A protein has these predicted regions:
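Extended, low-polarity transmembrane helix blocks
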Residues: 1-25, 32, 41-49, 53, ...
Length: 123
C-alpha cells in the first residue's frame, strides 16, 4: 500500500517536471506565452525553478507538506490566469484538470508523504 503513496507523488509531479524542463528548452516561447496573458517576464525563472525543484522534493518525500501546499496554490493560480476561456473546450478541461491536480496536492498537504519518504526517515 505504501508504494501507492510513492506512485501518487510521482504521478502528480511528472507534469510539472516535464513542463519546467520544456520551459528551459523553449524559453523564448515561454516568455511570449506568459506575456500574452500579461504575466511579467521576470516570473519565468521562478516558475521554472518551482516546476522542477518542488516536484523533485515531492518525489523523494522531503518537506512534502510545504511543497504540496505551494504546488496547490501555484496550480490554482495558473488555472485562474491561463485557463479561464470557458468557451474553448480545451481551456475548460485544463482548468478542471488543474483543480483536480490541486486537490491531489491538498490531500498530500493534509496527509503527508507516507512511509517511503525522507520526511518519514527524518522524523
Amino acid at each position: 500500500m505504501h508504494i501507492i503513496e510513492v506512485l501518487g507523488r510521482i504521478f502528480l509531479s511528472t507534469i510539472f517536471l516535464l513542463e519546467g524542463i520544456n520551459k528551459i528548452f523553449n524559453y523564448e516561447g515561454t516568455i511570449e506565452f506568459m506575456e500574452s496573458f500579461n504575466v511579467p517576464e521576470f516570473l519565468a525563472i521562478p516558475t521554472i525553478i518551482l516546476e522542477i525543484l518542488f516536484p523533485l522534493l515531492l518525489i523523494i518525500g522531503y518537506q512534502t507538506k510545504i511543497c504540496a501546499l505551494v504546488l496547490a496554490i501555484f496550480t490554482l493560480t495558473t488555472a485562474l490566469i491561463f485557463h479561464t476561456d470557458f468557451t474553448n473546450q480545451m481551456q475548460l478541461i485544463s482548468f478542471l484538470k488543474n483543480f483536480a491536480i490541486a486537490g491531489g496536492f491538498l490531500i498530500l498537504f493534509i496527509n503527508g508523504s507516507g512511509k517511503y519518504s525522507l520526511d518519514h526517515k527524518l522524523s
